[in-house]
């Protein structure tokens, strides 16, 4: 079996793939040998699953018929692309195009496979739980036992918050990763509680954002939410792409499965420093709000199958969703922009010569800011890697990385138009990290700088600079150095302004063995303070440490 086998592979094996014949027969065997239920009627009468057995048998009958038709057509169990076209011709779908008939048939398959996969999972978990003790510790109406969590003796109609709260609890713990079968059935039976009023409620909006900020298990949380129908109910646009095929040579997963893999890639990139992705690991842990990246990842392909440009459609729906969550207009617009532009970076890096200045100029006209560039780069990398593992390679990675680095350098060389909204948002994100006394010091400093300073410096950089200022608040000069990316050094200097200061600093850095490759030069509104940032690298094989460079600067 190939390394990316899944229920949502575009060419499934109708006997062995998850959610097909093997899964259903395994569940039947457990029910027969452990519960004495030796027929489908007996299983139905025993109410094994609270939401009814009819949907499960319908799913089984569909996949069984599909397998029979595939066997007749190809003498194999694998429903490959050629077989899909042939089988769909005989599936009473002649009133639509061949492409659409395949998509309709396969969407029905994926829905059926999901139903059988869930049935198999529930039966297996019921068997495991059969010998376990009752749930013990209670947390906010939620009970935990070993690695499972559940809701007991609670009417969800009066406690709707528990629907999301149970996923929040899983995200808090490394030990808890599963929901017990009774609670899964309870949530599925009450899925209609997630209605328009629920979706518009600020409490549940904040809960959803907290789920996205989970420290643990986020990928499995989102998949479980989808399995139980929670994600589709809360994001109706997501329901429309469940089982949606991508009928091309690039995608090997349905839209919903591809979406989960994008978020999983982001998650792994954040948690682990994978070989070759050191830069991306650093970037993803520095972006101000990880939930912005996750939401963009969830929505970037949700416009597919609706007719028209899926990026434009997704941009509108993601903007409305972010506003519904109560996110700021800056954050909502960034999410919408990411969805709208999510293809531009891969397109330019692979189709144009990025060594040409005009190519970089064209690209940064779309991006404009470093913060937007960081988010777009991370979304692009993880989107491509989740499309088809066999098509991702180091060459594509290097093209994207080169485009990112060249664009970042170019953006830093250009004057940035002042944006009061962006400046205000970044100030707020920085000040919230400090206490009242420190905040007052920083406010006085910020008030003496115009908006272009805050557009040029992203939230992470401003936070670092602010920490240096607070640490050295009684000194006339503030100097800080830190390693960034792979072999670069960022140097921040805040000092009393004077004539020729920039020239003096560049000469000092040059004598220290550092080559200046980028610089942000700012003076305060009253022209009394200089706040300069240099991006440098070691010249040749200079072994000077960053602390030595800082000492040299202080001696100027």
Where are these regions (language model features)?
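Non-catalytic interface/linker regions that flank or bridge core catalytic/transmembrane domains
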Residues: 1-251
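Amphipathic, well-packed alpha-helical segments that form the structural scaffold of globular domains
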Residues: 25, 121, 226, 236-239, ...
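Alpha-helical phosphate/pyrophosphate-handling elements in metalloenzyme active cores
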Residues: 30-42, 252-293, 320
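Divalent metal-dependent catalytic cores for phosphoryl transfer on phosphate-bearing substrates
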Residues: 44, 53-65, 254, 282-413
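Hard-cation-handling environments
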Residues: 418-434, 440-446
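Edge strands and adjacent loops of beta-rich recognition modules
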Residues: 445-485
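Segments forming glycine/polar-rich beta-alpha architectures that bind adenosine-containing cofactors
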Residues: 468-526, 535-538
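Single conserved hydrophobic/aromatic residue that forms the stacking wall/gate
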Residues: 545-556
């Amino acid at each position: 079996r190939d390394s990316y086998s899944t229920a949502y592979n575009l060419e499934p094996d109708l006997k062995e793939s998850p959610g097909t014949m093997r899964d259903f027969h395994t569940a039947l065997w457990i029910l027969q040998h452990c519960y004495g239920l030796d027929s489908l009627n007996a299983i139905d009468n025993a109410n094994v699953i609270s939401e009814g057995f009819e949907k499960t048998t319908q799913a089984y009958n569909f996949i069984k018929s599909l397998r029979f038709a595939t066997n007749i057509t190809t003498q194999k169990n694998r429903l490959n692309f050629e077989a899909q076209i042939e089988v769909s011709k005989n599936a009473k779908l002649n009133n639509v195009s061949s492409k659409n008939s395949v998509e309709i048939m396969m969407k029905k398959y994926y829905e059926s496979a999901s139903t059988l996969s869930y049935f198999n999972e529930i039966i297996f978990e019921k068997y495991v739980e059969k010998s376990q003790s009752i749930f013990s510790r209670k947390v906010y109406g939620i009970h935990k036992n070993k690695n499972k969590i559940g809701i007991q003796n609670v009417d969800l109609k009066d406690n709707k918050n528990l629907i999301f709260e149970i996923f929040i609890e899983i995200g808090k713990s490394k030990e808890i990763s599963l929901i017990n079968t009774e609670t899964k059935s309870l949530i599925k039976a009450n899925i209609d509680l997630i209605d328009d009023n629920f979706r518009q409620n600020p409490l549940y909006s904040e809960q959803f954002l907290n789920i996205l900020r989970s420290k643990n298990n986020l990928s499995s949380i989102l998949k479980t939410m989808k399995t139980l129908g929670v994600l589709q109910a809360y994001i109706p646009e997501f329901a429309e792409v469940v089982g949606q095929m991508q009928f091309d040579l690039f995608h090997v997963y349905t839209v919903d499965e591809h979406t989960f893999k994008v978020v999983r890639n982001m998650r792994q990139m954040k948690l682990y420093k994978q070989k070759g992705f050191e830069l991306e690991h650093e970037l993803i842990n520095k972006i101000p709000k990880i939930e912005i990246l996750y939401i963009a990842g969830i929505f970037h392909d949700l416009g597919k199958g609706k007719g028209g440009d899926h990026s434009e459609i997704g941009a509108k729906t993601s903007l409305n969703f972010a506003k519904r969550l109560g996110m700021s207009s800056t954050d909502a617009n960034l999410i919408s922009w990411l969805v709208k532009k999510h293809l531009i970076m891969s397109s330019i890096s692979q189709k144009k010569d990025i060594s040409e200045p005009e190519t970089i100029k064209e690209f940064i006209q779309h991006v404009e800011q470093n913060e937007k560039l960081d988010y777009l780069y991370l979304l692009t990398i993880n989107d491509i890697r989740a499309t088809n593992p066999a098509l991702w390679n180091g060459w594509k990675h290097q093209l994207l990385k080169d485009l990112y680095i060249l664009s970042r350098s170019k953006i830093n060389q250009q004057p940035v138009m002042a944006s009061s909204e962006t400046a205000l948002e970044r100030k707020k994100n920085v000040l919230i990290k400090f206490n009242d006394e420190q905040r007052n010091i920083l406010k006085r400093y910020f008030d003496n700088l115009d908006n272009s300073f805050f557009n040029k410096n992203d939230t992470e950089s401003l936070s670092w600079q602010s920490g240096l200022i607070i640490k050295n608040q009684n000194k006339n000069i503030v100097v800080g150095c830190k390693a960034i990316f792979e072999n670069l050094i960022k140097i921040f200097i805040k000092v009393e302004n004077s004539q020729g200061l920039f020239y003096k600093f560049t000469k000092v850095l040059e004598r220290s063995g550092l080559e200046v490759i980028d610089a942000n030069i700012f003076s305060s509104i009253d022209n009394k303070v200089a706040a300069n940032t240099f991006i440098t690298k070691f010249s040749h094989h200079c072994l000077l440490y960053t602390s030595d460079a800082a000492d040299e600067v202080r001696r100027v």
